[in-house]
């Protein structure tokens, strides 16, 4: 996929002497798909990486939906025609993006949208070390993807209701399994999101899968 600006050249900015500003939108948009996996040691790098993850996930899922439309296949049959394999956590925002597209764009009620989503997504975990699992600062995530944040909170609310029934009175289990990390600055735990939103989770080896 390639990212392009909706407006490649700003004539107004150019005419008032803002030559850099006249192409700023074009350069900023093209950067999303030009170089993958930027150094995320800076705020700008983190922001670009999250934009990239969402861009490629959204473009791919929308293309899958378009393919169903072209063949006049009901969106409810999405899992019968497409399976989304999350190879590690980088594309995990697919869980929230597919829900957004189904609920907001296709006007499907939540429970059916969740059934379609979980039947369509599988996740391969690459590490069990908590410090190595991808997390996004909640404020950054909310700023760039406000609707996805709302959807993730609703997914988490419903998931934790199930956890409470299974582990009544165990607040530590709720904290451990929550998609939203509460320690320090709040974060979105992408491995948790991928696990909750998948019909199958595996590791990269048999022992790894058993440990998961």
Regions found by a protein language model. Give the residues of each.
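A conserved ligand/cofactor-binding region detector
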Residues: 1-212
